[in-house]
């Protein structure tokens, strides 16, 4: 009979094999859309349920029909990007308006709900660390209201937005595209910081999950190359390919790219005549492990974006 220690050794081998053989790209055109109590239409992209070996995190896409709202619930931290549409977020009974490219950070266990007040469906991306929270038996999710049609009389009673900040401790809740912070870095054609790599930039206070930045890769160029623990990219615009762990992975607008846990070297390439834009999600668990061993410190091989032929 196998003892517990040999079981651990075998588990270590299995983990490495799983990460090496796992998918790297979630295809936006092949998603399994479902209706849930929270969303009229939602699909997991990068998640354990879809075969990705994440560090307890996930990326989801969801849509809110015209004249509808999401459910109202509470759970751990969440980072949201509005890909299309307009409306507002109610967070702890305070209103925060949104439009295309607005980014939200939902504090831990704050009640929240999204409302579509525009003339087209709202499409949004959501990053969560639900699986990690559940694994350590601290995952609490509570549904207060279900998704459904807006009540016009109720909407009329909602006060106007007062601030983009949370009155509880002053942290930032929302940021709009014109407020993104253009960096002087040369690792891509351009880099815009949102919550930043620490999750603390531009007034945010993200711990478990952050939308750190947007990368712009120019036509016929390649990004810098490096290795670090887990991160996600979502293709906002354009098409290209990434080299991760020595293998090439093609992707198009609407796809999501998974740089898995570990230290796989990776680089992103734009072989087209148009700009590429990638939205970057990162999760705080990576810094917990980075602080324990210098082998997980980011390793940069090429510090600047260059032409494809260089």
Regions found by a protein language model. Name each.
Residues 41-47, 58-74, 195-200, 211-227, ...:
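Conserved short histidine dyad/triad with adjacent acidic residue
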Residues 79, 93-108, 246-262:
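Short acidic-glycine-tyrosine-enriched beta hairpin
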């Amino acid at each position: 009979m196998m003892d517990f220690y040999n079981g651990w050794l075998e588990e270590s081998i299995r983990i490495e094999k799983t990460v090496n053989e796992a998918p790297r790209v979630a295809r936006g055109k092949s998603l399994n859309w479902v209706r849930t109590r929270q969303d009229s239409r939602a699909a997991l992209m990068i998640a354990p349920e879809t075969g990705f070996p994440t560090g307890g995190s996930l990326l989801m896409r969801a849509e809110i029909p015209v004249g509808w709202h999401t459910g109202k619930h509470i759970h751990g931290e969440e980072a949201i990007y509005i890909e299309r549409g307009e409306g507002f977020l109610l967070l702890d009974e305070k209103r925060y308006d949104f439009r295309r490219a607005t980014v939200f950070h939902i504090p831990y266990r704050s009640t929240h709900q999204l409302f579509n007040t525009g003339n087209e469906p709202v499409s949004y991306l959501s990053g969560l660390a639900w699986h990690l929270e559940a694994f350590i038996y601290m995952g609490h999710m509570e549904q207060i209201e279900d998704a459904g049609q807006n009540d016009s009389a109720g909407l009329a009673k909602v006060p106007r937005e007062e601030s983009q900040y949370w009155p509880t401790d002053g942290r930032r809740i929302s940021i709009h595209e014109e407020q993104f912070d253009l960096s002087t870095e040369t690792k891509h054609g351009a880099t815009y910081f949102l919550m930043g790599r620490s999750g603390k930039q531009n007034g945010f206070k993200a711990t478990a999950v952050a939308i750190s930045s947007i990368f712009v890769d120019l036509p016929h160029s390649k990004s810098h190359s490096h290795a670090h623990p887990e991160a996600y990219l979502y293709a906002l615009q354009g098409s290209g390919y990434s080299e991760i762990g020595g293998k090439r992975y093609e992707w198009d607008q609407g796809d999501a790219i998974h740089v898995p846990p570990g230290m796989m070297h990776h680089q992103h390439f734009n072989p087209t005549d148009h700009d590429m834009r990638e939205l970057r999600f990162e999760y705080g668990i990576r810094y917990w492990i980075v602080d324990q061993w210098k082998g997980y410190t980011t390793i940069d091989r090429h510090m600047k974006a260059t032409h494809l032929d260089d």
